[in-house]
Amino acid sequence: MSVGDALTKKDVTVIHVIATVELRPGKRDTFLTEFHRNIPNVRAEAGCIEYGPTVDLRTGIAVQLPVRDNVVTVVEKWESLDALRAHMAAPHMVEYRGRVKDLVVKVELQILEPA
């Protein structure tokens, strides 16, 4: 997965990313251990404002989407699109993706800008 030429708007000042990571059954704890090992590297990157994993919370609120026990949602905020691109290509991210690839079914990104 890479952030490539499809993202061409360079003048966006804050980038929000919601990464939905679907995991193989029973692999969430192992994935989160690897994820937490990489957090200090990511938060030290230039342009990182926020970066952290979240999991679905059972609330009983009627309009909530169904709870997914095999999903980790990563909430990110970056100072710029260039910072996000650099993050995606960082050596520690390449290494991290290699460590978790057998735990992951798929990753979907929402890349957002303030409205």
Name each model feature, range by range.
Residues 15-21:
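Active-site-flanking beta-strand signature of metal-NTP-handling nucleotidyl enzymes
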Residues 8, 24, 86-89:
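Alpha-helix initiation/capping motif
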Residues 26-32:
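Short, conserved charged micro-motifs
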Residues 28, 61-62, 85:
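A generic structural signal for short coil/turn motifs at secondary-structure boundaries
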Residues 37-49, 68-110:
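An amphipathic, aromatic/His-enriched active-site/gating alpha helix that lines ligand/cofactor pockets
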Residues 2-13, 52-70, 95-115:
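Glycine-rich beta-strand-turn "strand-cap" elements at beta-sheet edges
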Residues 22-26, 78-79:
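Structural beta->alpha junctions
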